[in-house]
Amino acid sequence: MKRFVILLLTAVLALTMPLSALAAGQIEVTEDISVSADYDWTRFKGQNVTLNVYNWGEYISNGSDDSVDVVAAFEKLTGIKVNYTTFDSNESLYAKLKSGAANYDVIIPSDYMVAKMISEGMLMPLDYSNIPNFQNIDEEYRNGDYDPENAYTVPYTLCTTGIIYNTKMVDEAPTSWADLWDEKYAGNILMFNNSRDAYAIGAFKSGSSVNPQTTEEVDTVVDELKAQKPLVQAYVMDEIFDKMIGSEAAVGVYYSGDAITMIDDNPDLAWVFPEEGTVLSVDSMAIPATSEHEEAAEMFINFMCEPDVGKANIEYIGYTTPMHCVWDILDEDLKYSEIAYPSEDIAAKEEVFTALSDEVNSELDVKWSEMKSYDEGGSGYLFLMLLAAMLALACFNIWRKVRRKTRNMY
């Protein structure tokens, strides 16, 4: 993969452009955000339109820690109100949409979940006349296998998975996914609390594909995860922030962008790409088929692809941008981050999730649930044993009292 080289060449070209050209035709929304004037941003003003946006937690610049409030800027510019809520895994996003429990206008699923949703008719085709900023998306990140013609999605960010560890709590840095099965880390390991990412770790460890083709493959890899379970402190998603920043665990697995955020908050933390490889994911913006505000949703997606907006988001969340025009204006530390923009050697070992067959996906869901409940079942058994012992003791005490009373009668 040549993304770093491509972005570097783009930066050189950008330096040759007149500054006046970069600033031409702009509307200033806030001190930090200007947008293209060649777009009708105000056509929904006064129409009481509300967009329901469903995104990952900690995945947009929200005004905290002196960041830009991107949603507030969109509302100010367009007059559209945004009801912004979050999820913590692709699986919970899918379940929420599938159940019909809520109606959303913009969602941000990962590549393999996009493919699944497309196949099930859950996404609405996009009208790119309302998303001219799609031109800002780098060619390298268009037409992915999960959405071959970008008919349904616009890339938002990219990320990889790896190991984050506390340098004060480990004797030497982990180098392999297999290190997460080392008993020296017992009780100090944080694992993904979603089946697909956790499965990938077991697959890397066992030399299997992260995209299983048979139920037998699933069973074999989940057995690896089951063997690891006694060593795991907790299965987490966003909870990892507090635990790693607060030095409550020695090692954890998570996404590259969030690792940058955690390391910024705790300098004792460090990151490693395991030697077996890593998963590269593309998270994309999409519109559910049930949305009643398609055009306004497309306006939101177009806004998110504005360079200043992209810069604000990427600098806040630390993820990899799919837009060269955003990379060009990033702060230097992030622009050249080896976590966000890994070397060619690491990129060569990147694997990409693909949609699983219904049979394999069902098997993974079942085996993951069984693995997660394994200790819970044991704990439940111990609870019943304890309860039985308490009842037996109570019965024994009652028997003693009755026996004593009987003796006294004679």
Feature annotation, model-predicted:
Residues A23-K116:
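Early extracytoplasmic/lumenal segment of secretory-pathway proteins
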Residues I118-P125, D145-N150, M262-F273, D333-E338:
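Ligand-binding "clamshell"
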Residues E344-Y410:
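Conserved C-terminal helix/tail region of periplasmic/extracytoplasmic solute-binding proteins
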Residues N52-S67, D88, A102-E248:
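Extracytoplasmic ligand-binding site segments that recognize negatively charged/polar headgroups
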Residues N136, C159, V218-A227, Q233, ...:
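Periplasmic-binding protein-like
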Residues P288-K349, M390-L393:
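Mature extracytoplasmic/periplasmic domains
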Residues M113-K116, I245, V251-D268:
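A ligand-binding cleft/hinge motif common to bilobed small-molecule-binding domains
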Residues L15-V29, V402:
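Sec-dependent signal peptide cleavage junction
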